[in-house]
């Protein structure tokens, strides 16, 4: 199945010069959505994953069904002020400044093998901050999986030597 057939490209959104890759058509098609989830599940199968971690919001959309299929838990990564209990945080650089991500301080147990799942790998700031928090909690990042990678933005460099899987390249 060619998953790119289920990605809408929106020119000049959210600002001039950006081509936004919209995964909504993929999610709206049960066969395409299921296929994408199964591809990530297949990638995770041999990695002995204990927990899926997904950044808000589209990491939830992709990560939760993967966790369900694997029969394991899911831990959300959120912006500050969105999680109700004690959190840890990591800052990451954006095009015009610094942003912060958080996760519950008890989300990952030391030694747990974690797969980070998100819809998009762009500059890599989100995944780099997520890796930092997982490792701060003693987790082992066993891999990262993305629906889409925007190759020109070189997010792969932020991942370093961590194993990763991408279903579509743009």
Curated annotation (Swiss-Prot):
GO biological process: adenine salvage; AMP salvage; purine ribonucleoside salvage
PROSITE patterns given in the database record: PUR_PYR_PR_TRANSFER
Main location: cytoplasm
UniProt subcellular location: Cytoplasm
Similarity annotation: Belongs to the purine/pyrimidine phosphoribosyltransferase family.
Keywords: Cytoplasm, Glycosyltransferase, Purine salvage, Transferase
Alphabetized GO MF terms: adenine binding; adenine phosphoribosyltransferase activity; AMP binding
Record text on subunit structure and interactions: Homodimer.
Reactions accelerated catalytically: AMP + diphosphate = 5-phospho-alpha-D-ribose 1-diphosphate + adenine
Assigned EC number: 2.4.2.7
Naturally occurring in which organism (per UniProt): Streptococcus suis (strain 05ZYH33)
GO cellular component, one term: cytoplasm
Pathway as given in its UniProt record: Purine metabolism; AMP biosynthesis via salvage pathway; AMP from adenine: step 1/1
Protein's name in the database: Adenine phosphoribosyltransferase
């Amino acid at each position: 199945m060619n998953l790119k057939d289920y990605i809408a490209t929106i020119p000049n959104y959210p600002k001039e010069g950006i081509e936004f890759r919209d995964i909504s058509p993929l999610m709206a098609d049960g066969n395409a959505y299921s296929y994408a989830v199964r591809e990530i599940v297949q990638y995770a199968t041999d990695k002995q994953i204990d927990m899926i971690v997904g950044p808000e919001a589209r990491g939830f959309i992709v990560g939760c069904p993967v966790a369900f299929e694997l029969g394991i838990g899911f831990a959300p990564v959120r912006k500050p002020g969105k999680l109700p209990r004690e959190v840890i945080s990591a800052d990451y650089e954006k095009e015009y400044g610094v942003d912060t991500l958080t996760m519950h301080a008890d989300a990952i147990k030391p030694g747990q093998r974690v797969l980070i799942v998100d819809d998009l790998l762009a500059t890599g700031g989100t995944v780099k901050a997520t890796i930092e928090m997982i490792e701060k909690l003693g987790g082992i990042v066993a891999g990262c999986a993305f629906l889409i990678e925007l190759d020109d933005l070189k997010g792969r460099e932020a991942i370093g030597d961590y194993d990763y899987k991408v279903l579509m390249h743009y």
